[in-house]
Amino acid sequence: MSDHAVNTPVHAARAHGHRAPRAEFYVYFAVILLGAFPVAFVSWIVSTIRHRRLPKRGPFASAWFDAKAITPLIFRA
């Protein structure tokens, strides 16, 4: 008989879910951040002019948020 409790989905999820980010992840993150910053800056300027008040997030925070959301999607694919 085989032991089915050894590689349960719970153990597999724990083993693969908490990997330490590698250098490749940081390189992709930096490239995406550098690409997202000009777009976020223009968007921030347009929003400031349009609404006549400063948005809650600045352009760097917005670009950081976008890079933080996009980079893991690349590694999951």
From Swiss-Prot:
User: What's this chain's function?
Assistant: Required for bacteriochlorophyll biosynthesis. Directly involved in the assembly of both the B875 and B800-850 pigment-protein complexes.
Family under the similarity heading: Belongs to the PufQ family.
Q: What is the protein's given name?
A: Protein PufQ
Pfam families, from UniProt?
PufQ
Which keywords has UniProt assigned to this entry?
Bacteriochlorophyll biosynthesis, Chlorophyll biosynthesis, Photosynthesis
The processes (GO biological process) annotated in the record are: bacteriochlorophyll biosynthetic process; photosynthesis
